[in-house]
């Protein structure tokens, strides 16, 4: 069996946007991992919001915006209410202008639309406000198209990423963002460059994304996030050196006390993990004709170095141990690889789910012609995971077909609350599949919309029953329905991916058994037999040599916490060569 070689594009997962699929291709759900949460709104602190009313090109080659003429008396009265910050009354009056009740011209209707969105923002109906600002951002001819960019940035501090404000920021260009490059609004300028970079990244415009991320200054609270996306953008264009440099800048900034970071230890570990994955990906080259892998030992060693920097208390530590096991395997360091797997399968981590670790263990035994041991590992693997796979698929069958996203979302909430009627053998697997940060942000978005709906229902009855009140209620209902559908769809894809990967690992186990049978009959493919380890080689690669800081202590069947991560297993080759 030829081991699957992961590349950085496959394994780096920073809870990032899923790049948009190429034309004719379906989008693939992004894995869950660890992008930093949406920043909290900043306090005023003397910052000035400059309203930029002067005209400029919109960058889209569109015709000039409409011009507002003389306001009707009703529109002027609505604007006065707005200026007096009587947001409730202003919203109702402005909505009448927008709907044409007052007979105002298109230009004044657009002005009223803009002021209506601001009024709703001030009333803390952020989703309803965003719905209107979205309409404005979609129309470069709108008289307040440019000014809306400021409010999109404000909304991004109130609504989480699943609201997809980044998509609306993507309607703007460098020149329009550059208008905020002044002493009073530089924080906004950095934030908008980060958001526009995210838009370019999701649309696979990686070089453009990198250029925009590099405009985010070290003083910005978005700096660390911008550097993460700089790194993974370089990974996407297969430039490992600048990718690693971006991740190193994150660690340097954290060491220097950069602002705007809530969980420094987690981000430091994530940066180490990302560097390890990048080095590992670039260390292995596979010949397209022979499918034989060649390894750059320097880069592979660098990958191991950064995996070892992930703290044992980190949520990423087990991931680092498992991924490092493949690197040790590629380097021929089987004692290290098997030792890591021994840690992963210890009783200290009863809820961990690394079925591929058993596959790797069997591959190592097979490579050393220990066919009986390899067969035993595969048999134990099948005995444990085949029933789990069957149960996972049984649940999945209940959510096949159309319009199953909302029912699965309800199932997701039940599981997170400790319910869901799950067998205890699969509960931790399902919980892990449905607990990544991107999915949790979608759940938080639904909760936020429900909280906004509660605020709306506590608003004055006159507002609720007004035409704008009905629009606010409708906007919240639509947004919640879409958010639930999106969260359910994402959860389904996470669950399906776990099932698909487990099926793949079970098939890999069967392939190993086939190769074992062929080897025992001396019919093994030459490519596979050339990859096996001779007895002489096993004396080099299969023994355990402690350094001056460590001693060998035989394992007696009892695990100790302080030994986790330090296990080694002697491997003796049974190959005849």
Regions found by a protein language model. Give the residues of each.
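Extracytoplasmic/secretory-pathway proteins
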Residues: 10-14, 21-77, 93-95, 101, ...
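Alpha-helical segment of the N-proximal tetratricopeptide repeat
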Residues: 64-96, 100, 191-205, 281-298
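Short solvent-exposed coil/turn linkers within tandem alpha-helical repeat scaffolds
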Residues: 65, 98-109, 133-147, 162, ...
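"A position-specific structural signal for the A-helix of alpha-solenoid helical repeats
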Residues: 76, 115, 151, 188-195, ...
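TPR-repeat structural position
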Residues: 87, 126, 162, 206, ...
């Amino acid at each position: 069996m030829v081991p699957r070689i992961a590349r950085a594009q496959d394994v780096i997962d920073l809870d990032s946007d899923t790049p948009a699929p190429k034309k004719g291709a379906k989008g693939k759900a992004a894995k869950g991992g660890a992008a930093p949460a949406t920043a909290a709104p900043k306090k005023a602190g003397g910052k000035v919001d400059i309203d930029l009313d002067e005209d400029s090109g919109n960058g889209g080659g569109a015709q000039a915006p409409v011009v507002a003429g003389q306001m009707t008396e009703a529109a002027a009265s609505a604007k006065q209410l707005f200026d007096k910050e009587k947001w409730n009354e202003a919203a109702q009056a402005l909505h009448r202008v927008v709907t044409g009740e007052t007979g105002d011209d298109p230009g004044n209707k657009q002005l009223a639309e803009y002021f209506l969105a601001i009024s709703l923002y001030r009333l803390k109906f952020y989703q309803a406000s965003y719905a209107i600002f979205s309409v404005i951002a979609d129309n470069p001819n709108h008289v307040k198209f440019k000014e809306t960019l400021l409010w999109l940035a404000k909304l991004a501090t109130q609504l989480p990423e699943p609201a997809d404000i980044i998509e609306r920021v993507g309607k703007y260009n460098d020149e329009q963002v550059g208008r905020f490059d002044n002493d009073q609004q530089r924080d906004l300028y950095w934030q908008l460059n980060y958001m526009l970079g995210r838009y370019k990244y999701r649309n696979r415009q990686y070089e453009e994304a990198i250029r925009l991320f590099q405009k985010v200054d070290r003083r910005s609270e978005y700096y660390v996030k911008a550097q993460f996306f700089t790194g993974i953008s370089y990974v996407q264009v297969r430039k490992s050196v600048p990718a690693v440099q971006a991740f190193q800048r994150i660690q340097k900034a954290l060491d220097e006390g950069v602002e705007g970071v809530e969980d420094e230890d987690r981000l430091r570990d994530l940066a180490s993990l990302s560097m390890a994955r990048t080095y590992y990906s670039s260390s292995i080259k596979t010949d397209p004709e022979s499918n034989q892998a060649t390894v750059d030992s320097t880069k592979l060693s660098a990958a191991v170095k950064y995996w070892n920097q992930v703290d044992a208390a980190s949520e990423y530590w087990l991931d680092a141990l498992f991924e490092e096991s493949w690197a040790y395997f590629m380097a021929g360091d089987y004692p290290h690889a098997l030792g890591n797997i021994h840690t992963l399968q210890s009783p200290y981590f009863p809820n961990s789910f690394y079925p591929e670790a058993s596959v790797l263990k069997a591959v190592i035994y097979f490579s050393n012609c220990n066919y009986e041991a390899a067969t035993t590992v595969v048999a134990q693997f099948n005995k444990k995971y085949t029933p789990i796979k069957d149960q996972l698929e049984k649940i999945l069958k209940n959510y096949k077909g159309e319009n199953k996203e909302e029912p699965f979302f309800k199932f997701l909430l039940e599981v997170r609350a400790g319910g869901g009627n799950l067998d205890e053998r699969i509960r931790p697997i399902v919980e892990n599949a449905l607990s990544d940060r991107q999915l949790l942000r979608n759940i938080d978005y639904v909760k936020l919309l429900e909280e906004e709906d509660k605020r709306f229902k506590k608003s004055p009855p006159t507002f609720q029953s007004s035409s704008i009140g009905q629009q606010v209620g409708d906007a919240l209902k639509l947004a919640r329905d879409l958010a639930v559908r999106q969260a359910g769809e994402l959860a389904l894809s996470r669950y399906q991916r776990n099932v698909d990967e487990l099926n793949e690992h079970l098939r890999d186990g069967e392939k190993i058994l086939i190769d074992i049978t062929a080897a025992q009959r001396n019919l093994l493919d030459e490519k596979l037999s050339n990859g096996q380890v001779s007895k002489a080689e096993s004396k080099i690669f299969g023994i355990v040599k402690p350094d001056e800081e460590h001693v060998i202590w035989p394992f007696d069947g009892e695990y100790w916490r302080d030994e986790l991560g330090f296990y080694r297993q002697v491997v003796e080759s049974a190959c005849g060569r």
